[in-house]
């Protein structure tokens, strides 16, 4: 254990659980650890976490850049983003009618609020303990509220279609895009989950696909950016792509993950569905 970490532990003990005023560097327990109950600090430069009486302070790494030094890209089919990613993503969500995608974590309140205004969504997240209400961690107020927000999101696959005023799954255009969607009581929620609980192999995708009211795919958002509050403090990147060829490939990937997805309040911590050639 390094001397700096030893000193930190002494500081926290001597101050009777009062956080040390020093900012220190230490790897968090999980590389992609997301928002917790204590993560709603609106300070733009520092967010504080309390974990097993060790106090973590995260500085906003975006502050290392004094200005946006990136050039405007003239290629209209792809746009890179490095700053204000939440703002740009919310703008794309607001313009869309339907949104689908695979996102490792969905905990950003502003993004969830934007998704609530859509005609319909279908988003797959990584399978986590807090999604199952029977797990101990899931009983925390923060996670109870988060699951309640998931339940309030509009389900694309059970909505009515704009173009034919019928069930969207009866729409010819929908079926041309998504093929024969298999729906059951196991995958009928707006937010689904895929993966294995407490396992390092994760459903680690980060992409959203946007559709207009006529079910025309208009763009895909992808990159390193997690849809979480803490990601706004990290150095992240994202691409917005309007190439129909590229969008079609992301739809294929969504459907592949969908086949092994279930409602977010999962019943089994193992992977849903059977693999033809499982590798261990």
UniProtKB/Swiss-Prot annotation:
Coiled coil ranges: none
Biased composition (Basic residues): 1-10
Biased composition (Acidic residues): 32-41
Biased composition (Basic and acidic residues): 11-31
Pfam family, one: PLDc_2
Disordered, as annotated region: 1-45
Stored InterPro entries: PLD-like_dom
UniProt name for this protein: Uncharacterized protein L381
Biological source species: Acanthamoeba polyphaga mimivirus (APMV)
Organism lineage string: Viruses, Varidnaviria, Bamfordvirae, Nucleocytoviricota, Megaviricetes
């Amino acid at each position: 254990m390094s001397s700096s970490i030893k000193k930190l532990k002494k500081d926290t003990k001597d101050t009777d659980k009062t956080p040390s005023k020093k900012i220190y560097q230490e790897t968090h327990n999980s590389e992609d650890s997301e928002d917790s109950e204590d993560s709603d600090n609106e300070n733009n430069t520092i967010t504080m976490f309390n974990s097993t009486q060790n106090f973590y302070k995260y500085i906003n790494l975006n502050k290392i850049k004094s200005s946006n030094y990136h050039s405007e890209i003239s290629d209209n089919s792809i746009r890179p983003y490095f700053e204000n990613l939440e703002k740009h993503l919310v703008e794309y969500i607001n313009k869309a009618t339907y949104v689908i995608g695979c996102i490792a974590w969905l905990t950003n309140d502003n993004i969830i609020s934007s998704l609530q205004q859509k005609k319909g969504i279908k988003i797959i997240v990584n399978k986590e303990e807090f999604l199952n209400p029977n797990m101990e961690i899931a009983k925390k107020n923060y996670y109870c509220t988060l699951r309640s927000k998931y339940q309030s999101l509009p389900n694309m696959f059970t909505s009515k279609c704009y173009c034919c005023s019928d069930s969207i799954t009866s729409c010819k255009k929908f079926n041309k895009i998504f093929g024969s969607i298999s729906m059951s009581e196991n995958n009928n929620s707006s937010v689904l989950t895929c993966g294995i609980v407490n396992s390092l192999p994760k459903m680690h995708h980060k992409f959203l696909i946007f559709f207009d009211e006529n079910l025309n795919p208009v763009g895909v958002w992808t990159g390193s950016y997690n849809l979480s509050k803490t990601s706004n403090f990290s150095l992240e990147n994202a691409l917005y792509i309007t190439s129909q060829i590229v969008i079609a490939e992301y739809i294929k990937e969504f459907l592949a993950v969908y086949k092994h997805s279930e409602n977010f309040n999962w019943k089994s911590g193992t992977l849903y569905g059977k693999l033809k050639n499982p590798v261990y």
